[in-house]
From Swiss-Prot:
Residues 36-1010 are extracellular. Ca(2+) 2 binds at residues 328, 330, 332, 336. This is Integrin alpha-8. In brain, expressed in deep cortex, hippocampal CA1, basolateral amygdala and striatum. In kidney, expressed in glomerular mesengium (at protein level). The chain crosses the membrane at residues 1011-1031. Ca(2+) 4 binds at residues 458, 460, 462, 464, 466.
């Protein structure tokens, strides 16, 4: 029996009652129940209430003196009574069953007297102290006998300097509470802590099966503790109100032990059971602080009170032995022991241990031989799992005893919980079958729901044991009644179990087309203790239930064309088989593909609650440990031999139409796949092609007569992309065909040397369903064609320049010489991209400290970063505004292909000299300025352009008249890197020269003619012409001879038809 909070004065050793304190105010964590309710009824709950603050419910028991009478006993150790001058002496309440509003719980008058007194020096002084004695902290009933104790009862010792010692006392009630007797086994002359002065007799309490009493006194002998047994008959026979110090001859007690056993608390909990193989019970006592605070439980011989066997806890300060209970859990005829350790700490993480509590079950294998314990562990921090453990009896009538475990400070607002564990042949189920939730909160102390438990009694006479749960912090006791358990034995019978789609023997109403069908028979029988003769179930049959939601159900009920049907199923006699038949048909073959997987049919059932009237009786419940779902399978007949099992032999091969693709290219490729079946039919055969992340599915090849145009679709499962092609249902024996799948591969920048397509044929066949795994590897390469080209603008300079002379020390750009621009273009033809290149220019800058082409500005287009060595414009000449580009130059800068950037212009005023070839000036014979450019990323078809604006240093060349020169700049490039994981073995490089010619021309000589000379010449010319004309006229040069004319006009001659006469 679990204990409560006790207080009292300290002795000359450590204070005892602080160590015996068991009420905790620690916070509990929320705990979610592991399962649904089983057969303790939580709806028709009976609740008894006691006075506020009385700790009503701290202890409790059933009181069943005979087969016709049942009631509940409840201890309230802080209740006030009618005893004069006694404050919170405590009481035990009698609560009648069945509970009615008019029937209140009443105090049982175990003791109605004040403190007894003695005369000391002429003054009456109390010899006992009943205030705050915690009467009712323990209460036990055995048939018609009831014992209740006050472990904090004090008495005045018979010493010269008397002390007030908490010896504890108990009261016995018999004959339906008509006779009472007190027994205080530790109230004697052996006082003080070293004796039995701090005994606290009645701290724990139990009965042997013969009715003898076991009393625990954990404070005796410097809190070594002790256990006392006594016969109820001896207590009654030898009781005398006046005889305070009374020793019963038949009383048995454990003796004092060596000092090393101090502070052990023997008797903290007690129970009785049979463990030696004889017919006489032994007692079991918890010693939670023994064994160096590890705690242990002892089996003690009931005859001579000697210790027989110990069970030791596994963790220090876990309070192993806080509770002990005896029960034959596995129904093998031998008693088993359960031990609570509510302060056990789970050390999954050493830095953050959790106090969760444990309960240990020791199954007895033979006399004094026990199996290794089964351990149940709590889940809620500070819930105090194992503070109370109760033997319930066979709660669900399955032949094995069940156990309740209290977790009084668990759950929401520390409302408490009670966990029900059912027994089985191996012990207890590891998961609770039911979790009772505390329903009372408290703003002061926790309600303590589950701190006290009592079972193994049938209060409502329905042949099922019931459970009492106390919540002392709220002053409540709840009666949970067990519901009758109905065990259903159900089955599904299918005929035939193999369906021939060609055998269409059923007719759908209102449809002329026959269909293939089979029958479904639902049969069930019921069994259970004390259940009604008529039990109604609500049953549901689901056809093809493993098909996912939204998928086509292959079978339907003939009467409603649905894949499920719910119906009432009434059974009127236990163990009698009841059946009901249904016809089921298959859809047309064109409506579904799956012919191989079984047609799974399920029957699930529940009790039809509508048939149970709302009465005081508790409703039955289905057996928690019997599955309420029954399944069966039917199969479709396939052409797979006598065994109806198809074993295909699928083969697969594949090859690409190209074995290499280039990064940056369009990269269209086709996989040519051959699929064949050399075995039996493969059902729902499909080709799966896993698409690499670099590729995209384009479609199936339909223009090649040698390739079959199958039905294929793109799918995505999670992050896997695939193409799935239907190969037939079934893919029959001897199938052999090829198909082509087209893909585009645009994303190759981050890939390795190759990409892989994974292929496999899969079917729904059970045996050998898949083909070989095929992997097609495509190699990846990077190729970039890069060219460098340049142009000079203008391509030649003609000296001298008309009406212009250079300055010896120019200050402006225009004073230097004619403009010369060189433009260089680095062009990536592709298809791959280049990401890191170098462009170098050697520029004809000077010779013998004389400038040649003097640079003023560098202009770039595209990803270019340039620097020069030495710096440009070293004379710090003021540059001119940048001139606008000519159309030819603009086109060049737009990457246009220009055959002739600059046309050859006419020179009407000068004649070009052709006497000698030009002398070439380049970096091999002059001083060059170096231009170095870093080129960034260039994709296929992209360019980078460098434009160098300079002036011909005219002064240098005018000193060398008639010498022809060609000024050449040399531009080169080298690709350093491409933006891919794998680099090609050789990267592009190249160079070219750009020339500007300097040539000379000699001007024509022209004479100046006076104006009067020109006028005189014109007049003289006119005079000569006039004289000549006059001479010719005089000579008759202008006269003409004409033929003779008649009177006929020209028109008449032209229109006359006659020939003129001679």
């Amino acid at each position: 029996m679990s204990a409560g909070t006790h207080c009292g004065p300290p002795g000359n050793r450590a204070p005892p009652f602080a160590r015996l304190c068991c009420v905790s105010a620690a916070l509990g964590m929320l705990w979610s129940p592991a399962c649904l309710a089983f057969n303790l009824d939580v709806d028709k709950l009976t609740v008894y209430s006691g006075p506020e603050g009385s700790y009503f419910g701290y202890s409790l028991d059933f009181y069943i003196p005979d087969a016709r009478t049942a009631s509940v006993l409840v201890g309230a150790p802080k209740a006030n009574t009618s005893q004069p001058d006694i404050v919170e002496g405590g009481a035990v309440y009698y609560c009648p069953w069945p509970s009615e509003r008019s029937a209140q719980c009443k105090q049982i008058p175990f003791d109605t007297t004040n403190n007894r007194k003695i005369r000391v020096n002429g003054t009456k002084e109390p010899i006992e102290f009943k205030s705050n004695q915690w009467f009712g902290a323990t209460v036990r009933a055995h048939k018609g006998k009831v014992v209740a104790c006050a472990p904090l009862y004090h008495w005045r010792t018979l010493k010269p300097n008397p002390a007030k010692d908490p010896v504890g006392t108990c009261y016995v009630a018999i004959q339906n509470f008509s006779a009472y007797a007190e027994h205080s086994p530790c109230r004697n002359s052996n006082a003080d802590p070293e004796g039995q002065g701090y005994c606290q007799a009645g701290f724990s309490l139990d009965f042997y099966k013969n009715g003898d009493l076991i009393v625990g006194g954990p404070g005796s002998f410097y809190w070594q503790g002790q256990v006392i047994t006594v016969s109820i008959a001896d207590i009654i026979a030898n009781y005398s109100f006046k005889d305070i110090l009374r020793k019963l001859a038949a009383e048995k007690q454990t003796d004092v032990a060596p000092a090393s056993y101090d502070d052990s608390y023997l008797g903290y909990s007690v129970a009785a059971g049979e463990f030696t193989g004889d017919s006489q019970q032994e007692l079991v006592a918890g010693i939670p602080r023994g064994a160096q605070n590890f705690g242990y439980v002892s089996i003690i011989n009931s005859t001579d009170m000697t210790f027989i066997q110990n069970f030791t806890g596994e963790q220090m300060a876990s309070y192993f032995g806080y509770t002990v209970v005896v029960s034959d859990v596995n129904n093998d005829g031998m008693d088993d022991i359960l031990v609570g350790a509510p302060l056990f700490m789970e050390r999954e993480f050493e830095s953050n241990p959790r106090e969760v509590g444990q309960v240990y079950l020791y199954l007895q294998a033979s006399a004094l031989l026990f199996q290794d314990p089964q351990v149940l562990t709590g889940t809620e921090t500070f819930g105090r799992f194992g503070s109370s453990v109760a033997h319930l009896g066979d709660l669900n009538q399955d032949g094995y005893n069940d156990i309740a475990i209290g977790v009084p400070f668990a759950g929401k607002d520390q409302r408490g919980k009670v966990l029900i564990y059912n027994g089985n042949p191996r012990g207890l189920h590891s998961k609770p079958s039911q979790v009772l939730q505390g329903i009372w909160g408290s703003q002061t102390i926790p309600s303590g729901f589950g701190f006290s438990l009592r079972g193994d009694a049938d209060i409502d006479k329905n042949d099922y044991p019931d459970l009492l749960v106390g919540a002392f912090g709220k002053g409540k006791v709840a009666v949970y009644r067990a519901r009758p358990v109905v065990t259903v034995d159900a089955q599904l019978l299918l005929h035939p179990m193999i369906i021939n789609l060609e055998n269409k023997t059923c007719q759908i109403p209102e449809f002329p087309t026959p269909v293939a069908c089979f029958s479904v028979r639902v049969c069930a029988s019921i069994a259970g203790q004390s259940i009604s003769n008529t039990i109604a179930l609500l049953a549901e049959v689901q056809l093809d239930f493993l098909k996912q939601k939204g998928a086509i159900k292959r079978t339907l009920f003939l009467h409603n064309h649905q894949s499920h049907f719910t119906f009432p199923f009434v059974m009127k006699q236990q163990k009698s088989l009841h059946c009901q038949d249904f016809m089921v048909y298959l859809r047309d073959e064109t409506e579904f593909r799956d012919k191989l997987s079984p047609i799974n049919i399920s029957l699930n059932y529940s009790l039809d609650d509508s048939t149970f009237k709302d009465s005081l009786e508790v409703k039955p419940i289905l057996n928690h440990y019997r599955d309420n779902v029954v399944t069966e399978q039917a199969h479709i007949l396939v052409d797979c031999g006598e065994d109806n099992l198809c074993v295909p032999d699928l083969k697969l091969s594949a090859r690409p139409d190209k074995h290499q693709i280039i990064i940056g290219d369009e990269n269209h490729l086709m996989l040519i796949i051959n699929a064949r079946n050399e075995g039996e039919g493969a059902y729902e055969a499909e080709l799966f092609v896993i698409i690499p992340e670099e590729a995209d599915y384009v479609g199936i090849e339909r223009n090649n007569k040698g390739l079959r145009p199958l039905s294929c679709e793109y799918k995505m499962e999670n992050v896997t992309r695939m193409v799935v092609c239907d190969l037939g249902n079934p893919m029959v024996t001897g199938t052999n065909f090829s198909l082509g799948l087209r893909f585009a591969v645009p994303r190759l920048e981050k890939t390795n040397m190759s990409i892989n397509f994974d292929l496999q044929i899969r079917s729904s066949n059970k045996d050998n369903p898949d083909s070989n795994f095929e992997r097609v590897q495509i190699n990846i390469t990077a190729i970039a064609q890069v060219e460098i080209r340049g142009v000079s603008h203008p391509p030649q300079i003609v000296l001298p320049i008309h009406n212009w002379e250079p300055e010896k020390k120019p200050h402006k750009e225009e004073e230097v010489g004619p403009l010369v621009e060189h433009i260089y273009e680095l062009h990536n033809i592709g298809p791959s991209t280049i990401s890191d290149s170098i462009l170098d220019v050697g520029w004809p800058f000077s010779a013998r400290d004389e400038f040649l082409l003097y640079i003023f500005h560098l202009q770039t287009l595209g990803p270019l970063q340039c620097q020069t060595n030495p710096e440009i414009n070293p004379q710090d000449i003021k540059p001119a505004a940048s001139p606008e580009d000519t159309p030819e130059l603009s086109a060049f800068l737009r990457n246009a292909t220009i055959p002739h950037l600059v046309r050859k212009r006419d020179v009407p005023v000068v004649q070009l000299h052709r006497q000698s070839p030009a002398r070439i000036l380049n970096c091999t014979n002059i001083d060059c300025l170096q231009i170095s450019c870093a080129v960034g990323r260039l994709g296929g078809g992209e360019s980078a352009v460098l434009k160098v604006r300079s002036r011909l240093w005219a002064h240098t060349f005018l000193k060398r008249k008639n010498d022809h020169y060609a000024l050449a700049s040399l531009v080169s490039f080298e690709v350093k890197k491409m933006p891919y994981k794998e680099q090609p073995a050789k990267l592009p490089a190249g160079s070219t020269a750009v020339k500007t010619s300097v040539i000379w021309a000699t001007p024509n000589v022209s004479f100046s003619i006076p104006l009067w000379v020109i006028i005189l010449a014109i007049l003289l010319g006119l005079l000569v012409l006039a004289i000549l004309t006059l001479a010719l006229w005089k000579c008759g040069f202008f006269d003409r001879a004409r033929p003779p004319q008649d009177e006929m006009t020209d028109r008449e001659q032209l229109t006359s038809d006659k020939t003129p006469e001679a």
